[in-house]
Amino acid sequence: MNIRPLHDRVIIKREEVETRSAGGIVLTGSAATKSTRAKVLAVGKGRILENGTVQPLDVKVGDTVIFNDGYGVKAEKIDGEEVLIISENDILAIVE
């Protein structure tokens, strides 16, 4: 991938969602919701504070994160893959 996010932006790729229930039933519609887990592909240099210093991001490339899938999420196709460009503020947790 040849893209670098700016400031506190993070590029993530959504994890695949299981489309079958534990009993083998194929899930469709609202039962097959999009995953809010993703792999971090790239991170910006950090948030610029009021005093001009840069605060590095808490997430790093390779982290698996849980994110808020709402306002502020921008989907793009890069190298044929759909990725999301979000602010670090939209990341709720790092999965360890």
UniProtKB/Swiss-Prot annotation:
Protein's UniProt keywords contain Cell inner membrane: no
CDD domains to which the protein is assigned, alphabetical: cpn10
Cellular compartment(s): Cytoplasm
Highest taxon listed in the record's lineage: Bacteria
Main location: cytoplasm
Keyword Glycoprotein annotated: no
Keywords: Chaperone, Cytoplasm
InterPro entries cross-referenced by the UniProt entry: Chaperonin_GroES (IPR020818), Chaperonin_GroES_sf (IPR037124), Chaprnonin_Cpn10_CS (IPR018369), GroES-like_sf (IPR011032)
GO biological process: chaperone cofactor-dependent protein refolding
PROSITE patterns, alphabetized: CHAPERONINS_CPN10
Gene Ontology cellular-component terms listed: cytoplasm
GO MF, any single term: protein-folding chaperone binding
Subunit structure: Heptamer of 7 subunits arranged in a ring. Interacts with the chaperonin GroEL.
The protein's role, per its UniProt record: Together with the chaperonin GroEL, plays an essential role in assisting protein folding. The GroEL-GroES system forms a nano-cage that allows encapsulation of the non-native substrate proteins and provides a physical environment optimized to promote and accelerate protein folding. GroES binds to the apical surface of the GroEL ring, thereby capping the opening of the GroEL channel.
Family: Belongs to the GroES chaperonin family.
Protein's recorded name: Co-chaperonin GroES
